[in-house]
Amino acid sequence: MDNNKTKEGKTTHIFERPIAITDVETTGLDFAIQEIVEIGLVIINQKTLEIIDTLDVKVKPEHIKTANEFALKVNGYNETDWKNAITLKEAMSIYGEKTKDAIFCAHNVTFDWSFIFEAFRKTGIKNQMDHHRIDLFTMIWMKLRNSSFEKFNLNEVAKRLGVPEEPMPHRAINGTMTAYKIYKK
């Protein structure tokens, strides 16, 4: 596929494509075993940094027995709050449509992308995103590499940049909004 063409054949230069800032909450760290339980998404205009669209969706886990208890504590998962959660296939269908031709961005791109990629594969939903990835961690590292950090997580970076910290429990849309505010810096 031509790098400057959308899936419909429209010409869109890479610097004109939207950015899909994504955060996933999962039942653990291993994308091959654990599952997505929440997806947060902020689509922004790359030039203006204005928000175009958002997504905040809880996903019903199919194999909660494989969950890591610490992960569930961090993201606040509980059966009551997830009573009306949708299936992974439904969530990825919505996510896939919203992110069409967008460039994937995350604070920890390897982690979030591995779960999103696996979810596209598992559900059979076609990934129509641009093949490039933006790693917010790397962008921040370049800006703050001469600073001293005990931890280099999203909240520590937010504090350094004057962005409000993400509230706990860690929710996907809150992580995404914090990442968006950091991206704008």
Regions found by a protein language model. Give the residues of each.
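Conserved non-catalytic scaffold segment of RNase H-like nuclease domains
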Residues: D2-F117, N155-H170
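Juxtamembrane/interfacial segments flanking transmembrane helices
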Residues: E150-L154
